[in-house]
Regions:
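Hydrophobic alpha-helical membrane-insertion segments
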Residues: 102-124, 229-233
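Hydrophobic alpha-helical transmembrane segments of membrane transport/permease proteins
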Residues: 1-29, 118-157
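Hydrophobic alpha-helical segments of integral membrane proteins
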Residues: 10, 14, 24-40, 50, ...
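Cytoplasmic-entry segments and transmembrane alpha-helices of multi-pass inner-membrane transporters
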Residues: 79-114
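An internal, D/E-rich "acidic patch" concept
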Residues: 21-77, 305
Length: 305
């Protein structure tokens, strides 16, 4: 469970090595300096530097979550817009019912269902891993798609195709719930904008439905969705940690689960810090982007504070 000194001399050496003889403030300052220097300690199980292990595992999770987020935006926003434009119709009722049902499906159950159906029953898609073991792809960046492009003496087209096949089931498992949530959020935003006075004024001027939607409705409806996308990022990463274990995906989630099983507390601590830092950075980036495209929001917040 930790480093246990065998004698007094080893005890003193460990105290000096980790600056435990200093005050709490000095220890915390030393901790921050080592943290920003990339010295995150070593794994208690493998003995490898944690910075190297995290930098290999984290890009795999980012790649998986980014592909899932692409599916969420590609499917969720158009379906939400379509449902909102036909609010309270039979089509809207069908899409809304499917999205509510999909939102209630547990991600682990869905992932197991995909494995049983598309991998074991039909054999259409790979069961686990990021790529077939026959492809020797050196992990230069940690992002498999980029590493394939940088690799030498490899059939890049075949490797890229195989990597995409390995992505399908994990990505769909992660994106399923978030897509359902995005449909409902977009639908509600479209309905709210359609009831605004400036939309009624645009209709009275004789603008067509297509002109009203693309010039006035879409942009104003997407503005409230951007801050909520930060919440979807958290959901995607949380679901990715579960899905990675089921699909043996070598990401940070699977790595953290293994650290829990092996009681590798130093790896668990630094892994959670890396994930939380990533989520905070993405949230801040989305908020800054939202302020950039919607300056009125900053004025509104300055008035309400």
């Amino acid at each position: 469970t930790g480093i246990m000194p065998q004698n007094l001399m080893q005890h003193e050496a460990l105290m000096n090595q980790y600056h435990l003889n200093n005050s709490i403030i000095v220890q915390f300052a030393d901790y921050l300096s080592e943290l920003f220097a990339g010295n995150w300690g070593v794994s208690l199980i493998s003995g490898q530097p944690l910075s190297e292990e995290i930098m290999l595992a984290l890009p795999a999770t980012i790649e998986l979550s980014a592909c899932a987020m692409f599916i969420v935006i590609l499917v969720g926003i158009p379906l939400g817009c379509y449902s909102g434009l036909r609010a309270y119709s039979a089509t809207d009722f069908t899409i809304n019912s499917i999205s509510v049902t999909a939102y209630s499906v547990p991600v682990f159950w869905l992932a197991v269902l995909f494995i049983l159906t598309f991998s074991l029953q039909f054999g259409w898609l790979p069961l686990s891993g990021r790529i077939n073991l026959l492809f020797d792809i050196p992990p230069k960046t940690g992002f498999l798609m980029i590493d394939i492009l940088l690799a030498e003496n490899v059939d890049k087209a075949a490797a890229f195709s195989d990597a995409l096949l390995h992505l399908i089931l994990p990505v769909l498992s992660i994106a399923f719930i978030s897509t359902a949530s995005m449909i409902r959020i977009t639908r509600r935003s479209i309905i709210d904008v359609l009831n605004k006075p400036f939309i009624i004024a645009a209709r009275s001027k004789g603008l067509s439905s297509k002109q009203i939607f693309f010039r006035h409705v879409l942009r104003n409806a997407l503005l409230p969705i951007l801050p909520l996308m930060a919440m979807q990022i958290t959901t995607l990463i949380t679901n990715a940690m579960i899905v990675e274990t089921l699909f043996s995906w070598p990401g940070i989630g699977n790595w953290l689960i293994q650290a829990i099983y092996q009681r590798d507390y130093s790896a668990l601590r630094m892994g959670m810090l890396a994930v939380s830092t990533l989520v905070v950075m993405i949230t801040i980036a989305i908020d800054l982007f939202n302020r950039l495209i919607d300056p009125s929001r900053e004025k509104y917040e300055s008035v309400t504070i």
